[in-house]
Amino acid sequence: MYQKEIEQRRTFGIISHPDAGKTTLTEKLLLFGGAIQLAGTVKARKATRHATSDWMAIEKERGISVTTSVMKFHYRDFEINLLDTPGHQDFSEDTYRVLTAVDSAVMVIDGAKGVEPQTEKLMEICLLRNTPVITFINKLDREVLSPLELLADIEKKLQIECVPMSWPIGMGKSFRGVYNLYRRELQLFTPGASTRGGEVFVIRDLDDPELDRRLGSQADELREDIALMEGAANPFVYEHFLKANQTPVFFGSAINNFGVRELLDAVVELAPSPRPRLATTREVLPSEEQFSGFAFKIQANMDSAHRDRIAFVRICSGKFTRGMKVRHNRIGKDVTLANATIFMAQDRASVEEAYPGDIIGIHNHGTIRIGDTFTEGEELRFTGIPNFAPEHFCRVRLKNPLKTKQLQKGLNQLSEEGIVQVFRPLTSNDYILGVVGVLQFDVTMVRLLNEYGVEADYESVDYAAARWVTCPEREKLENFEKQHRSNLALDSEGNLIYLALSQWRLSNTMEEWPDITMHKTMEHSQRLN
């Protein structure tokens, strides 16, 4: 029974460049999975509904996903956990952390633009982690690049072999649907965002006159394309897909429901069930009986009526049951998980039991941090959940000095969520904020004002790069601190970080101090020295 529950789980994230149609696709997957009845039109600012997965106020205002939503739904005989990731170009750090909690990913490509910069960045992470990727080429209802151009672009830029699983019939105004190369099925859809399905015709033989009747002159084009594909395309090898060496490719139009159902079918048929996870001491198998999991995200104020905080925990092994006692390893305390929840964007429901691959929400009263591990007693720490060295910096100046406590509390919570990193220089009482993408400053500003009543000025500072600093020899580290005190700060964990005024200065310092190690990333909640 327990093994069956594991095999029925599919936990995946959706990654893309901004505006490739990721949020629309997320909604349509939920629609086809029966989780929602009506898809919200994401870009329609005047519409009364907002996209289900973009629920925070700043997201509704700007039409971008800046936090991560977790949505659970049932499809066929499978339990799907879909993680919608920030789509804005500035949110790769938060997106990266989400990719530590998934077993596979769906990559959305805008058919008119091909591979774009954020897609490359996120695919690098998937390839590093050997995360299997299914590709969905979107917006075929518009004028797009040719299918062969798109496949060549993916292979060249992302260094991954493409295997088309479906083939588009026309594009733009002449787009008629998709032909499933593996099922030998022709799928013709009626355009329209409210359509949940479409006509499907089984065409076992491409010479079938039914094809000509349905497609007219496009039937011969389809025959030529498929003959070309079958001669040149690589065969699909499941082991290559699992190692992220090969990606199955589907074509469609999310806004018009073209190709969405077969993409969802591919997720349940091809994407792996929960996989083993690496901890500091050993590999943890999902089939192990003892419960284990890690927090990959902290979200404050999911319910505007209550100042609550939720830790998103990915279950790695064992079975979760409501009211169970677990060990919070970092602080060495046993805690009772009495009110865990599952998510559907902002909607929540109590959960009685959950299995590996599931994402549960645990109420957090300030004790849980990103990267924390929970077990049934074993001393474990799951690895691979890093902080990135920030690339943009600013100084916070309070308009009202009496709000210092609120500022400290707000920054503390936002840094634990991974929204912003907070540094305290060794030579002043300033608060220096560091982010990977500048939009995070806007999010920090809006949330400090709305949630903590903090009005502040945000001044740019001259730092160009940051690196965490370690050295096994105490004396050398102390000498380094003396000479570079004005460029050193402490992060929220008390780790020493070097703030460089330029890339040249950073390189120069690294050359002058070969015994000092400069780290571009570090594990969450880790004390370095």
UniProtKB/Swiss-Prot annotation:
Domain tr-type G stretches: 7-275
Membrane-spanning intervals of the chain: none
Compartment(s) where it occurs, according to its Swiss-Prot or TrEMBL record: Cytoplasm
Pfam families in UniProt: EF-G_D2, GTP_EFTU, RF3_C
InterPro entries in the record: EF-G-like_DII (IPR053905), EFG_III/V (IPR035647), G_TR_CS (IPR031157), P-loop_NTPase (IPR027417), PrfC (IPR004548), RF3_C (IPR032090), RF3_dom_3_sf (IPR038467), RF3_GTP-bd (IPR041732)
Binding site for GTP: 16-23, 84-88, 138-141
Residue ranges the record marks as coiled coil: none
Main location: cytoplasm
Keywords of the record: Cytoplasm, GTP-binding, Nucleotide-binding, Protein biosynthesis
GO-annotated cellular components: cytosol
UniProt entry tagged with the keyword Zinc: no
Biological process per Gene Ontology, one example term: regulation of translational termination
Single annotated GO MF: translation release factor activity, codon nonspecific
Protein role: Increases the formation of ribosomal termination complexes and stimulates activities of RF-1 and RF-2. It binds guanine nucleotides and has strong preference for UGA stop codons. It may interact directly with the ribosome. The stimulation of RF-1 and RF-2 is significantly reduced by GTP and GDP, but not by GMP.
Classification via PANTHER family: PEPTIDE CHAIN RELEASE FACTOR RF3
Homology family: Belongs to the TRAFAC class translation factor GTPase superfamily. Classic translation factor GTPase family. PrfC subfamily.
Protein name (record): Peptide chain release factor 3
Organism whose genome encodes this protein: Syntrophus aciditrophicus (strain SB)
Classification lineage: Bacteria, Pseudomonadati, Thermodesulfobacteriota, Syntrophia, Syntrophales
